[in-house]
């Protein structure tokens, strides 16, 4: 058996003399008593067609993974295998994704490498319920939307899976939450319902054991941070951090400043490098960290400086031509983003952003 190669040689007893050279079967087997496998296709039978004669079959394994398995992804090969299995399931169970694949003429059985997986346009989260199965979701997260715009909706079947995802990502880049205090300056997110960012920050603040949300009380925020002896993370929406920098220019001690969410129409958009320089000068820090997430995703990517983002092992981001969603670009090129987020287990793990 070669599970790392996805191949398995079986010696089977032929019971029908009419078996052809190219026979195809389905098996449900347990590999090593641990990994459930599904839809094992057999082909390339060798030997002679005779009753009870021992024959050799080469079979391809499609591993049926569980949500637990995505957190054990350790390399690119494991990611590729998991991505293909999740694609096959979501192509069957997620109606908008299934319809999209049909409209663009993609047949599931022809998608045999991750590079061939089509990515669902993110706009469909505004017009369709991107969800697998019939079980009601535990929550529905929504995106920010200006007046007159339709927000995206992301049904979350399992809040436990979402919590496990953001906690695992946080530990990957920042270690155990208990060593930090987390202060959240997220005014526009707190003023509306359905924010996945607020949900995440609330749970991480509880895990840290210190910190909190500050809506408009900037003086209270700065006083609390000044008294706090622990290392601190100040997580703020970009425009709110800029306001804090202009009004108070506080020199923050033992603090990671982490921006997220953009200007949301409250401030002018400026190049990220210039914005980070303004914050560094005002707060007296050497680098600005960033969190990248969105309502349509389950996972987060983090930059720990230099605006270079890193993803957890179950998330992958690639660039594509903005005018051709099926034309990938090389690493380092500028373009639209294709995001594979394997933690989006019950919605769609393959999202095409603008």
What are these regions (language model features)?
Residues 2-13:
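Extreme N-terminal basic, low-complexity initiation segments
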Residues 15-17, 23-24, 34-37, 48-52:
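Short, low-complexity intrinsically disordered segments enriched in A/P/G/S/L with frequent Arg
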Residues 92-142, 148-155, 162-178:
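Active-site diphosphate/adenylate-binding microenvironment
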Residues 147, 162, 166-205:
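Internal, well-ordered alpha/beta segment that forms a basic, Gly-enriched binding/recognition surface
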